[in-house]
From Swiss-Prot:
<keyword id="KW-0963">Cytoplasm</keyword>
<dbReference type="InterPro" id="IPR045864">
    <property type="entry name" value="aa-tRNA-synth_II/BPL/LPL"/>
</dbReference>
<keyword id="KW-0820">tRNA-binding</keyword>
<dbReference type="InterPro" id="IPR012947">
    <property type="entry name" value="tRNA_SAD"/>
</dbReference>
<dbReference type="InterPro" id="IPR004095">
    <property type="entry name" value="TGS"/>
</dbReference>
<dbReference type="InterPro" id="IPR004154">
    <property type="entry name" value="Anticodon-bd"/>
</dbReference>
<dbReference type="InterPro" id="IPR012675">
    <property type="entry name" value="Beta-grasp_dom_sf"/>
</dbReference>
<feature type="binding site">
    <location>
        <position position="511"/>
    </location>
    <ligand>
        <name>Zn(2+)</name>
    </ligand>
</feature>
<keyword id="KW-0067">ATP-binding</keyword>
<dbReference type="Pfam" id="PF03129">
    <property type="entry name" value="HGTP_anticodon"/>
</dbReference>
<dbReference type="InterPro" id="IPR002314">
    <property type="entry name" value="aa-tRNA-synt_IIb"/>
</dbReference>
<protein>
    <recommendedName>
        <fullName>Threonine--tRNA ligase</fullName>
        <ecNumber>6.1.1.3</ecNumber>
    </recommendedName>
</protein>
<dbReference type="Pfam" id="PF02824">
    <property type="entry name" value="TGS"/>
</dbReference>
<dbReference type="InterPro" id="IPR006195">
    <property type="entry name" value="aa-tRNA-synth_II"/>
</dbReference>
<keyword id="KW-0694">RNA-binding</keyword>
<dbReference type="InterPro" id="IPR047246">
    <property type="entry name" value="ThrRS_anticodon"/>
</dbReference>
<feature type="region of interest" description="Catalytic">
    <location>
        <begin position="243"/>
        <end position="534"/>
    </location>
</feature>
Length: 642
């Protein structure tokens, strides 16, 4: 007679074993109708799974995040069901849940078209509307293998042979005539899988190995109701408009090409953005008393072996040979900074020593993962390392945290999620070192009243880290900043200082990045602002346009005056109608569009309008220049107002 304890502490006693669905029905018909699955003693279970001992139970519905994940997973099975009806010869591989949706990898000789995807969406909808029940059957390993062998599902057989113990009892989910294998849980009925949309098709190697066959991966999204689906699709539509690759081309910021995969060719305006961002960070470095250094692009393999990177990260490094020596192009700056620290005797009085670099790094990312500025092979880190004593750690980490928040606020990012990543399975150093490192970061966060989540096992191999994830205007998460303690690397590379008692001690090293990669952060900013950069950051801050040739010299004079004030100004003296010029530069997202005609020339004025179409009227040149300089110096996010 199991006693079921519900989340509110109430208990229900049953005369025989029950399922989550039975308990939901006992509470009320509405809950039974909404029940997707259950969390039994902390473990997710199918609604039909039997509970035969006293247990704690939470009933999962589509209102729960877990419920939405489950229905997304079941939509992948629905996809498989529909796909096998349309293409019986297909072989199904895997169909997991991903952020906001699901995908299924499928082996089919026929290359899928948009018409095929539309037909698949239609068939999935037809099947889901029948509200058929999903039948879960737990079977022996051999029975599962026999089932898929009879159906010619070679990928399922491979999974069984290579990944599942012969002593296991796999769960087979029957969707009418279609059968899939999964840990579950899944929805009990397809009535929960009504709000989905297939999004795209891409290639994917089986098991992510390029030596294996290329499969076709179908992506989909699924939500609990029509409203949530619509909101998501609208957000995707807005994200597509803001795609930094598209805007980068429109605004002539940069390009990438096949001969240099993952490497950025910065054009004039894009490089202006890059330099302005670098200038801003450099000013922050001055405020927080950092030295700026520059290390070599590549160093001998021996150094990377001593640092531990060769053993842990060799596959991600580009290498080259010269005069019988093997060199690695640096994927990160830290070993080089330790070399600079090691030049000359250091005393405890020299600590903390804060060392920063705009380091040009390279990582051998898989070609399939490259994505515009967001995932590249060559990038610039706004990297810094603080060498300090153990007693200085909390104060220095707190200063790093404050610098991160100061920086993000300038760009308008206020929703920041903080996570503490702890020791991974593969790591250097002993447990005592990791205990001290993790505790120091926790205390620094707590002393700053910052809420944080712990990510077990997600730290770097040389130390735990704090990760700062900012959320943009579309509520997308971008992990950018890190503050990471390292008790191991300085010792491995021989860094020491003379302590107050004249003993030689190893400094603690704090790794710190705010933007992470300048390239990636610029990609984020392009999408956050949709190319409408704040005036201080904009490549072109002002464009001066004449109405007729009579004002050409005056327009030149205005532009030169702005340049003397350090304002990035350009001119448009083409023999085009002024309306045409205004439209063109509005599309170029130039913050201020200045028109000069006979009257403006006579009165030494400019007619000012913003890229948003707001008419600010006529102003004296010096007056506007002063207002603009003030706005730029404050790094305001807003344009001048009427």
């Amino acid at each position: 007679m199991p006693v079921i304890t519900l989340p509110d502490g109430s208990k229900r006693e049953f005369a025989q074993p029950v399922s989550t669905l039975d308990v939901a029905a006992d509470i009320g018909p509405g809950l039974a109708k909404a029940c997707i699955a259950g969390r039994v003693n902390g473990e997710l279970k199918d609604a039909c799974d039997i509970i035969d001992t006293d247990s704690e139970l939470s009933i999962i519905t589509a209102k729960d995040e877990e419920g939405v994940e489950i229905l997304r997973h079941s939509c992948a099975h629905l996809l498989g069901h529909a796909f096998k009806q349309l293409w019986p010869e297909a072989k199904m591989a895997i169909g997991p849940v991903i952020d906001n949706g699901f995908y299924y990898d499928i082996d089919l000789d026929h290359k899928l078209t948009q018409e095929d995807i539309d037909a698949l969406q239609k068939r999935m909808t037809q099947l889901a509307k029948t509200n058929y029940a999903v039948d879960k059957r737990v079977v022996s390993w051999q029975e599962a293998r026999d089932t898929f062998e009879a159906r010619g599902e070679s990928y399922k057989i491979e999974i069984l042979d290579e990944n599942i113990s012969k002593d296991a009892t796999p769960a087979l989910y029957h969707h009418e005539e279609y059968v899939d294998m999964c840990r579950g849980p899944h929805v009990p009925n397809m009535k929960f899988c009504q709000n989905f949309k297939l999004m795209s098709v891409a290639g994917a190697y089986w098991r992510g190995n390029s030596d294996n066959k290329m499969l076709q991966r179908i992506y989909g999204t699924a939500w609990a109701d029509k409203k949530a689906l619509k909101v998501h699709l609208n957000r995707l539509e807005e994200a597509a408009k803001r795609d930094h690759r598209k805007i980068g081309k429109q605004l002539d910021l940069y390009h990438m090409q096949e001969e240099a995969p993952g490497m950025v060719f910065w054009h004039n305006d894009g490089w202006s953005l890059f330099l302005e961002l670098e200038k801003f960070i450099r000013q922050k470095l001055g405020q927080y008393t950092y030295q700026e250094v520059k290390g070599p692009l590549m160093m001998d393999r021996v150094l990377w072996e001593r640092s531990g990177h060769w053993d842990k990260y060799a596959d991600g490094m580009f290498t080259t040979n010269s005069e019988s020596r093997e060199y690695a192009i640096k994927p990160m700056n830290c070993p080089g900074h330790v070399q600079i620290f090691n030049q000359g005797l250091k005393s405890y009085r020299d600590l903390p020593l804060r060392m920063a670099e705009f380091g040009c790094c390279h990582r051998n990312e898989p070609s399939g993962s490259l994505h515009g500025l967001m995932r590249v092979r060559g990038f610039t880190q706004d990297d810094a390392h603080v060498f300090c004593t153990e007693e200085q750690v909390q104060q220095e980490v707190s200063a790093c945290i404050q610098m991160v928040y100061d920086t993000y606020e300038t760009f308008g990012f206020k929703n920041i999620v903080v996570k503490l990543s702890t020791r991974p399975e593969k790591r250097i150093g002993d447990d005592d070192m990791w205990d001290r490192a993790e505790e120091a970061l926790k205390q620094a966060l707590k002393s700053n009243d910052i809420e944080f989540e712990i990510l077990p096992g997600e730290g770097a191999f040389y130390g735990p880290k704090i990760e700062f994830t900012l959320h943009d205007c579309l509520d997308r998460a971008w992990q950018c900043g890190t503050v990471q303690l390292d008790y191991a690397l300085p010792g491995r590379l021989g860094a020491t200082y003379v302590a107050e008692d004249n003993s030689r001690q190893t400094p603690v090293m704090i790794h710190r990045a705010i933007l992470g990669s300048l390239e990636r952060f610029l990609g984020i900013l392009i999408e956050e602002y949709a190319g409408k950069f704040p005036t201080w950051l904009a490549p072109q801050q002002v464009v001066v346009m004449n109405i007729t040739d009579k004002q050409s010299d005056y327009a030149e004079e205005v532009v030169n005056l702005f340049k003397e004030h350090g304002i990035r100004a350009t001119k448009d003296l083409r023999n085009e109608k002024i309306g045409f010029k205004i439209r063109e530069h509005t599309l170029r997202r130039v913050p201020y569009l200045l028109v000069v005609g006979d009257q403006e020339m006579e009165n030494k004025e400019v007619a000012v309008r913003t890229r948003e179409g707001v008419d600010l009227g006529k102003m004296q040149i010096q007056e506007f220049a002063t207002k603009l300089k003030n706005q730029i110096s404050l790094r305001s996010l807003n344009l001048l107002e009427d």
